[in-house]
Amino acid sequence: MWKEKVQQYEDQIINDLKGLLAIESVRDDAKASEDAPVGPGPRKALDYMYEIAHRDGFTTHDVDHIAGRIEAGKGNDVLGILCHVDVVPAGDGWDSNPFEPVVTEDAIIARGTLDDKGPTIAAYYAIKILEDMNVDWKKRIHMIIGTDEESDWKCTDRYFKTEEMPTLGFAPDAEFPCIHGEKGITTFDLVQNKLAEDQDESDYELITFKSGERYNMVPDHAEARVLVKENMTDVIQDFEYFLEQNHLQGDSTVDSGILVLTVEGKAVHGMDPSIGVNAGLYLLKFLASLNLDNNAQAFVAFSNRYLFNSDFGEKMGMKFHTDVMGDVTTNIGVITYDNENAGLFGINLRYPEGFEFEKAMDRFANEIQQYGFEVKLGKVQPPHYVDKNDPFVQKLVTAYRNQTNDMTEPYTIGGGTYARNLDKGVAFGAMFSDSEDLMHQKNEYITKKQLFNATSIYLEAIYSLCVEE
């Protein structure tokens, strides 16, 4: 029944999704304003969702242009559906323009198809179809739309300062059948304090180093600019050998007497950096072989001592595992250095319930002082957990099982979704076990089958939660 309902809307679903995907809704602080708190792209995507909601007869409520909601249903309790329309930067290497959606016979290709614009449109159409069916709602629905999920969650922080907290809810921003627990997440900077000037002449001076754009992405590109005082050819040959030995792509050029070294890695979501290749850490590994100036030497030595080849916090003394939630993970997402201001490592750390976060950070902060580094802690989100046997979770899982015959149990993840904003919040779809996960990677796509099947599952689940009860 539900799949047949969705079939009647397939063309509309694709057209509305294409319109949303065409908006480059990447956070841009340089263009932020009161009207566009995280830049014009995210604001435009939020307005787009309001426009299609108004077209279809729904009411909306805007919260300072950084978040808002689409309203449906009636009743005392509120089901929250928490989505986001911002996306991570596209990066390089796409086979098509990431913001000009390509629709093939069986897929849609663009940045945001999986994370989170495709699932957002799927959830929206589930609500729209039920409204078109004139169902007798027993709950209200707030489809809450954020614009800063990929960075600092300013959107939901602002939203929940003044707006009603849903009784229960889900975020269509992960996988089926249901994610009932999420690791704690924090970002922090390891900031280098500048050392005294060199007493002895070094052979090489690191002028600048840059790798990574987002704390929650493994950097796939790194660039170092090095002043080489002698033996330029030897350095280039050593670098080429290093690339070959480590199965890496990279390049070396000379720009106005400065040696420019680049390394290409593999970008993946920061919740599991072990499956990516961190270009920045590899390039620092090479630089450690050079007789660099004091500051640079301390910077690259720190990377090798604590960060390189340590995706589970081993070198930082933070290795920890639980059977329910898995391991601590550490993603070094941003690395910068210049010879005027010294360096910085931007880290995204995720941890399971039971990890003594404050104790571990205090110990680490004290330990690294001797190497000229300090910790600047950002936002800390504690682990989030809902019992998988809760009736709410079971209703979601039942809708999934009815349509897929897949009896996989709900599980926990290292990723963080808006679900953790709610006491009784879980992540629910929209990826299936056979979906290719290209979130935060080039050539991100969603299959039409996945898009329509997710819509159908959301349709049944929302009906079960908001109409039958």
Curated annotation (Swiss-Prot):
Note on cofactor: Binds 2 Zn(2+) ions per subunit.
Statement: the UniProt record of this protein carries the keyword Metal-binding: yes
Pfam families, A to Z: Peptidase_M20 (PF01546)
GO BP term (any one): proteolysis
Listed CDD domains: M20_PepV (cd03888)
Alphabetically ordered keywords of this record: Dipeptidase, Hydrolase, Metal-binding, Metalloprotease, Protease, Zinc
Binding site residues for Zn(2+) 1: 115, 150, 440
Cofactors, names only: Zn(2+)
Positions contributing to Zn(2+) 2 binding: 84, 115, 173
Residues of the active site: 86, 149
E.C. numbers: 3.4.13.-
MF (Gene Ontology): acetylornithine deacetylase activity; dipeptidase activity; metallopeptidase activity; zinc ion binding
Record-stated family: Belongs to the peptidase M20A family.
Protein name: Putative dipeptidase SAB1611c
Record organism: Staphylococcus aureus (strain bovine RF122 / ET3-1)
